[in-house]
Amino acid sequence: MILPIVGYGDPVLRKVGTAITPDYPNLKETIANMYETMYNAYGVGLAAPQVGLPIRIFVIDTTPFSDDEDLPADEQKDLKGFKRTFINAKIVKEEGEEWSFNEGCLSIPDVREDVYRKPTVTIEYCEEDFVMKTEVFDGLIARVIQHEYDHIEGVLFTDKISSLKKRLIQKKLKNITEGKTFQEYRMKFAAAKKGR
């Protein structure tokens, strides 16, 4: 089922997600709905808070990046078909020299900004089988992981840009909060909850 994506300004996007257990209600359905919602919105990642759930789950599928001819062939190959569910994730290390990439977010439509992140990340997480694993990722896969991980920590990519850039996008952010934006995917907005 395609779920509405929560827009900027909703308090759920600022909550630190709660860890879950294997008996979390409708877990498989929740994850399937998250993937379906992400694909419907042409995203490469989606975190549970973005569908209104303050829990520690995010899903990614970097396949759309694999067509980028500006990337080295080996990275294109890594990106193609990389699909993963991260449950109760914890980034244990970020390393390397920060690099900039123009990021966007399904919860913040029509806003894109350059964000600096480290190129390599070590992360502990469970997949749907709840077996804990530790893996190292780099490049765009690491970046997507860091972006989605931020969501389960209550952090948005707009928190990582300069105060000048924040001022320049303030009107857009206010419009999103008030639901004054149009997307081809379903969204719900903080102002609508207040009787707007």
UniProtKB/Swiss-Prot annotation:
Cofactor: binding details: Binds 1 Fe(2+) ion.
EC primary class: hydrolase
UniProt xrefs under SUPFAM superfamilies: Peptide deformylase (SSF56420)
Residues binding Fe cation: 105, 147, 151
Keyword Transcription carried by entry: no
Molecular function (Gene Ontology), one example: metal ion binding
Keywords assigned by UniProt, alphabetized: Hydrolase, Iron, Metal-binding, Protein biosynthesis
Catalyses which reaction(s): N-terminal N-formyl-L-methionyl-[peptide] + H2O = N-terminal L-methionyl-[peptide] + formate
CDD domains associated with the record: Pep_deformylase
GO biological process, one term: co-translational protein modification
Enzyme Commission (EC) number: 3.5.1.88
NCBIfam families: pept_deformyl, PRK00150.1-3
Record function comment: Removes the formyl group from the N-terminal Met of newly synthesized proteins. Requires at least a dipeptide for an efficient rate of reaction. N-terminal L-methionine is a prerequisite for activity but the enzyme has broad specificity at other positions.
Family, per entry: Belongs to the polypeptide deformylase family.
Annotated protein name in UniProt: Peptide deformylase
UniProt source species: Flavobacterium johnsoniae (strain ATCC 17061 / DSM 2064 / JCM 8514 / BCRC 14874 / CCUG 350202 / NBRC 14942 / NCIMB 11054 / UW101) (Cytophaga johnsonae)
